Amino acid sequence: MSYAEKPDEITKDEWMEKLNNLHVQRADMNRLIMNYLVTEGFKEAAEKFRMESGIEPSVDLETLDERIKIREMILKGQIQEAIALINSLHPELLDTNRYLYFHLQQQHLIELIRQRETEAALEFAQTQLAEQGEESRECLTEMERTLALLAFDSPEESPFGDLLHTMQRQKVWSEVNQAVLDYENRESTPKLAKLLKLLLWAQNELDQKKVKYPKMTDLSKGVIEEPK
């Protein structure tokens, strides 16, 4: 077939048959899973998976304990305690990553607003965040969005209510986790996440070339649709 010829389209059934015939070593899949559990700090799950699969983690699982404590604090909204623990483990981390420090401080402001501590929130914003807002337009915008929650009787239902969702805490934790791993010269992004990003990149390249192919439209469920 010449390069000028249009390749035959492949149906979803044909694509699924090719996938089913592709042999992937179980050990390789298990290593991907273990890598994800360790990188994300899921110690108990990693220990259980090691017993079930026989795959050894790349690091001593005991080294995950401090990251687990930080994660628990952030997901509970105990931001000041998390900052103190980060500083005790890596005194220079927040000094050298000012944007991360701002996000932690911003999250503490969100927690004060969640608890309806309006005066404390305003004072904290003025004394701890105002200077960073003056230095960074991006920080100023984020601080203004956060303080805008105070203008609503039901901030959870406001246009800025996403800041009060639990996913906001998870977002901050993910940023902290990556920063800590980078600081410790460890892998900060799970290999599985890198593979998914590669998949999205490949699909985007095909879309731009107007290629019709069975496309994965839901990564979390592995949903593949017919070519369109």
Curated annotation (Swiss-Prot):
Main location per the UniProt record: cytoplasm
Any GO CC annotation of this UniProt entry: cytosol
Keyword check for tRNA-binding: no
One GO-annotated biological process of the protein: Wnt signaling pathway
Distribution of this protein across tissues and organs: Up-regulated in colorectal cancer tissues (at protein level).
One Pfam family here: CTLH
Entry similarity comment: Belongs to the GID8 family.
Subunit-level organization: Homodimer; may also form higher oligomers. Identified in the CTLH complex that contains GID4, RANBP9 and/or RANBP10, MKLN1, MAEA, RMND5A (or alternatively its paralog RMND5B), GID8, ARMC8, WDR26 and YPEL5. Within this complex, MAEA, RMND5A (or alternatively its paralog RMND5B), GID8, WDR26, and RANBP9 and/or RANBP10 form the catalytic core, while GID4, MKLN1, ARMC8 and YPEL5 have ancillary roles. Interacts with RANBP9. Part of a complex consisting of RANBP9, MKLN1 and GID8. Interacts with CTNNB1, AXIN1 and GSK3B.
Annotated PANTHER family: RAN BINDING PROTEIN 9-RELATED
Protein name: Glucose-induced degradation protein 8 homolog
Organism: Homo sapiens (Human)
Gene (name only): GID8
